[in-house]
Regions:
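A compositional/biophysical signature of low hydrophobicity enriched in polar/charged and small residues
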Residues: 1-151
Length: 151
């Protein structure tokens, strides 16, 4: 699908990343198409798996999670023994994102907590799987975006 994305598709992606609740009529106006053509393009992007969903952005601080950290985990187990860790990742909603990576660290996670003690509890749980390195997040310099985002 990527080779078939045209300038209009990229414009649609930029707009829906900026505002996932934008009405088709407004989206159509911004990308210079009719509402029906815009709706068809969005449907095609969804069916192709380019647009995978629409989510609300939740401010962790406003929901009682003022502490954010990046936790890196060196997991010593062989590749097939990662299921116990994956179960913990599913159970702990404070772990917002987890990426399996190359290099010294096997996993990199974005974690939120209600306090430093709460963060310590989460890190201690993760440390049962291997050595961890934790960095506190001071601020978000660049918000999460997709490729070609906000063009």
């Amino acid at each position: 699908m990527t080779e078939s994305l045209d300038v209009t598709d990229w414009a649609i992606l930029a707009e829906v990343q900026r505002d996932g609740r934008i009405p088709f009529t407004e989206l159509a106006r911004r990308v210079n198409l009719s509402a029906s053509a815009t709706k068809e393009r969005v449907r095609r992007l969804e069916e192709a798996g380019v647009i995978t969903g629409y989510r609300a952005e939740v401010n962790p601080e406003r929901t009682g999670y003022p502490v954010m950290a990046v936790v890196r985990l060196k997991y010593p187990g062989p590749g097939t023994r990662h299921q116990p860790l994956r179960r913990l990742l599913e159970e702990r909603s404070e772990i917002l994102e987890c990426l399996r990576t190359t290099g010294d660290d096997c996993y990199v996670m974005k974690v939120v907590a209600t306090s430093m003690a709460h963060l310590e509890e989460i890190v201690d749980e993760l440390a049962e799987f291997g050595s961890t390195t934790t960095n506190l997040v001071l601020s978000r310099t660049l918000p999460l975006r997709g490729p070609g985002g906000f063009g």
